[in-house]
Each structure stands twice: as C-alpha cells, then as structure tokens.
Design a protein with these regions (language model features):
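RecA-like P-loop NTPase motor core of helicase/translocase proteins
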Residues: 1-192
Length: 192
C-alpha cells in the first residue's frame, strides 16, 4: 500500500506542477521499489493535466547498473504489452536514439548510454561512423536532437543517490533538454 500511496502523491504533483520538478521516494531494502517504479512509469506516461493536455511525452526509467535490471524490465512490461509503449534499451546508444526519435512512451535504459546518444542519432540517420557522416546525415541528426530536446520527459532514476552526479548525469540533462531534469535541490521527499 505504501508504494501506491507514494505513486499517487507523485502523480498528483506531476499533474498540478508539470515537468521540471523533482520528487524523491525513499524505500528501504525489500519494500517494493520495483513496484513503485513500474506503476509510476505507466501512470506518468498517460498523465494529463486539468486541461486534458498530456503532461509528459516520454518517461525515461534509468538504472545505474550497466546491465538492465531484469526484474525492473519485467515489472514494467507486465503492465502494458502494446507494441511501442515500452522499450528496454539493452543494446546500444543507437537503440536509445531510435526510441527517443520514434516517440516510445516508456524507455528503460542505463545512465551509461546517454553520452553516446548523439553518435546514435548520426547512425540512425545513416552514417557509418561519426567521421564519415555526410552533411545531410549530420543535418538529420541535428534535427532529431532538437526535437528530442523540445519534448517533456519524466525521468525516474533507480538508485538516484548514485546516479545523479558527475559528467554522465550532465550529459543526460543536455540531451533531454534543460527543463527535463533539474538538479536534485528543493525536491519533495516522500519517505517509505
């Protein structure tokens, strides 16, 4: 029950305040963090404000493990099986770039893939390598980068205490746009 209560509070705040806010849900070991993350990701992916406008274009679930947490993936997939709703990024930055381009509602990835997204955009545009990219391929990648930065993201970070510092976190913020993820100051804390 405490997981559902925390999810409801974050969803209500997200509906009222919109993107660009920070919330912290603290869980003790074995208290249902996976449930909270999976329920929250689906609720935020379909969240609309009081004017019936979609609040977030995409929910990005980030784990700091280099190999995606299978339990977390399974929990998120169990809720929604429709094609294109959930995409686990278990290969490379090209796969992450494609998910951000095609409008996937929920993207599950590791933090380590974000520094390479721009290279993935070039590859998705048809370039074999960054050095061999044509002007047209670079222009397409730049257009996608601009489009990605304009979208509104909800970013759910598993183990946020170890994931939100350093160069990789700054690159995540740069790719998803300035308003997508703010520094973890002044955040609301709902403790479990």
């Amino acid at each position: 029950y405490h997981q559902l209560d925390a999810v409801r509070k974050v969803v209500a705040a997200g509906r009222a305040e919109g993107p660009g806010q920070n919330y912290l849900i603290q869980h003790s070991a074995g208290s249902g963090k996976t449930n909270s993350i999976s329920w929250l990701s689906h609720r935020l992916a379909s969240l609309h404000d009081a004017g019936d406008r979609k609040v977030f274009d995409c929910v990005v679930v980030i784990t700091d493990r280099r190999v995606l947490d299978q339990q977390l993936q399974d929990a998120i997939y169990q809720i929604e099986h429709a094609q294109g709703v959930v995409k686990a990024i278990d290969q490379d930055s090209k796969q992450l770039a494609a998910a951000l381009i095609d409008g996937t509602k929920i993207v599950i990835t590791t933090l380590q893939k974000f520094p390479f997204v721009l290279r993935g955009l070039l590859h998705a545009a048809g370039a074999e390598t960054q050095e061999k990219a044509t002007a047209e391929e670079r222009a397409q990648a730049k257009a996608w980068e601009s489009e990605i930065a304009k979208r509104r993201y909800a970013v759910i970070v598993d183990e946020a205490h170890s994931s939100q510092t350093g160069e990789t976190a700054r690159e995540l913020k740069a790719i998803l746009g300035a308003g997508a993820v703010e520094d973890a100051e002044g955040e609301t804390d709902w403790e479990d």
